[in-house]
């Protein structure tokens, strides 16, 4: 595989992973409002959030294959740990890295504000959120074992074990 082909592969995979991170984070946000009432709902939300975070991390590793590692890691660290003003500068740098389509998705995902509102600006660029039943069916076929476990758990009797208000 030559350098041009590997860059194309990295770019394509980065877009795909960014879209998946968006889907999982958005679906977790939607399922979290109102607060999950059962352990299986809570586990599903946690599995989606975890998957989104892993996809996001993978996007940054893929960007390192397209850009200077030091720059990408610096942007990633600022986005994870800095306050709003510095984060906005890092988002600006991120928007100019790698594949514009992928980094635009990442910038929108990492910006401050309501995730559902931000998703509306990306209509057509990321798949719309799935209904819970469809989501569970599709996650059951996932290669991610945590998503599969969460999907199988979500199929069990809903409301069977309500979370106590003390938690």
What kind of region is each of these model predictions?
Residues 1-167:
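Long, helix-rich interaction regions
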